[in-house]
Regions:
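Amphipathic alpha-helical interaction surfaces in cytosolic regulatory modules
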Residues: 23-98
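STAS-typified acidic loop motif
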Residues: 2-31
Length: 98
């Protein structure tokens, strides 16, 4: 089961993800992250994947969707601390938010 913990700061929102991100977990994560973005309207969203042990294509969709959402708000997304398993998925999808 995946979880997300948020650390807001002025103009930024950090989302620390842990666990396995699959199609079951993605929906709940998306709702939680979107609610925080809507409430805080950050200029920068940082998604930290250091605690993620597995990610399938649903995780790729989670990242792409948050990137589009941040772009629509005039902000940006940074993906950081992706373990090798996650980085391989990002490379296959040609995601360069890192």
């Amino acid at each position: 089961m995946a979880k997300v913990c948020f650390v807001p700061a002025q103009g930024t929102l950090a989302a620390y993800l842990t666990g396995e991100i699959d199609h079951h977990a993605e929906q709940a994560l998306r709702r939680e992250i979107d609610a925080q973005i809507d409430a805080r309207m950050p200029e920068l969203l940082t998604m930290d994947f250091s605690g993620v042990t597995f990610m399938d294509s649903s995780g790729v969709g989670l990242i792409l969707g948050r990137g589009r959402q941040m772009s629509g708000l005039g902000g940006r997304l940074v993906v950081q601390n992706a373990p090798d398993t996650v980085r391989r998925m990002l490379d296959l999808a040609h995601i360069h938010y890192v």
